[in-house]
């Protein structure tokens, strides 16, 4: 069965689910944002294809459905480049250890493992 967590915020709600163990689930990673004025779906994440479906035009995006493709990239290359620079003392990490700990604690609490 899919794993599910609901995170509530002041002005938003996040529903996170993992269907990796679900029979017939898609093998690709995806990310979807549902809002009051439309949706944005990134599926598959690699190579990136973003589909907007908007109730009204917003910025450079027209009303209705449209697809935006992104150039292919190699996952983790930039992450390892940043990590190497941090290990060498050339720059701090973009995400602090406190932020990483907060993410891990949130996931554990959402799974009932607090």
Q: Could you describe each region identified by the protein language model?
A:
Residues 70-77, 94:
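Short, well-ordered coil↔helix boundary/capping segments
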Residues 82-114:
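C-terminal helix-rich "cap/oligomerization" subdomain common to oxidoreductases
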Residues 31, 47-61:
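Short polybasic amphipathic segments
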Residues 62-72:
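C-terminal "lid/loop" region of Rossmann-like NAD(P)-dependent oxidoreductases
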